[in-house]
UniProtKB/Swiss-Prot annotation:
Belongs to the eukaryotic ribosomal protein eS1 family. Keywords: Ribonucleoprotein, Ribosomal protein. This is Small ribosomal subunit protein eS1. One of its GO terms (molecular function) is structural constituent of ribosome. GO terms for cellular component: ribonucleoprotein complex; ribosome. Coiled coil: none annotated. It comes from the Archaea. The gene is rps3ae. PANTHER family: 40S RIBOSOMAL PROTEIN S3A (PTHR11830). The lineage of its organism: Archaea, Methanobacteriati, Methanobacteriota, Stenosarchaea group, Methanomicrobia. GO terms for biological process: translation. HAMAP family: Ribosomal_eS1 (MF_00359). The keyword Membrane does not apply.
């Protein structure tokens, strides 16, 4: 009875709109509003937007950003970055007949102690041989590991969403086999400084050849 009465009392509370701000690395830009009858219920809520909406640049609509509310002050909810992902339609549009798509999964630790999973994809001009696929995948890994260890989370995410990291991979890997494009298709924050990440199996990197 007490629990039922508590739920009834919570439902009776007046709901309030809270302004949601992007993380500091994205300039605390407003990303929308969310409704709650208790500010504590906002903590942990995940907010999705696109880089296009955040920057008013329509060409960036294929980049989805995920933020998590981690603090509330007054009628404002603050967020932290937890990952990004390119839209499925966009990635599919890059796969052409008789070409290769070379995926990799790279777990890296930034200079400020964040464990980040980075998933690059390289798209070749024509179908690559197995040894070329292996070499390009290894170059992707080494570029990401080398860069991530020398910059903080903010710097890494900026290089991902602005395309600098994918450009660095492209410059090094094109010497192995001509590439049409390189994208960092997804990132995930696995753990913050001092946190223990949840156990997760790392999928095998794959190559997909257009038929």
């Amino acid at each position: 009875m007490a629990r039922r009465a508590q739920r009834k009392a919570e439902r009776a509370k007046v709901k309030q709109w809270y302004k949601v701000l992007a993380p500091e690395m994205f300039g605390r830009t407003p990303v929308g509003e969310t409704l709650a009858n208790d500010p504590n219920k906002l903590l942990g809520r995940v907010i999705e937007t696109t880089l296009g909406d955040l920057t008013n640049n329509f060409s960036k609509q294929n980049t989805k950003l995920r933020f998590k509310i981690d603090a509330v002050a007054g009628d404002t909810a603050y967020t932290k970055f937890i990952g990004h992902e390119m839209t499925t339609d966009y990635i599919r549009s890059l796969v052409k007949r008789r070409t290769s798509r070379i995926d990799a999964v790279v777990d890296v630790t930034t200079s400020d102690g964040y464990l980040v999973r980075v998933k690059p994809s390289c798209f070749t001009v024509k179908r690559a041989r197995a040894n070329q696929v292996k070499a390009i995948r290894e170059i992707s890994r080494q570029v990401i590991i080398s860069r991530a260890g020398n910059i903080d989370l903010n710097g890494l995410i900026q290089e991902v969403v602005l395309g600098k990291l994918s450009l660095d991979i492209y410059k090094d890997a094109k010497a192995v086999y001509p590439l049409r494009r390189v994208e960092i298709r997804k990132t995930e924050i696995l753990a913050g400084p001092g946190e223990v990440p949840h156990p997760a199996a790392v999928p095998e990197p794959t190559v997909t050849a257009g038929s």
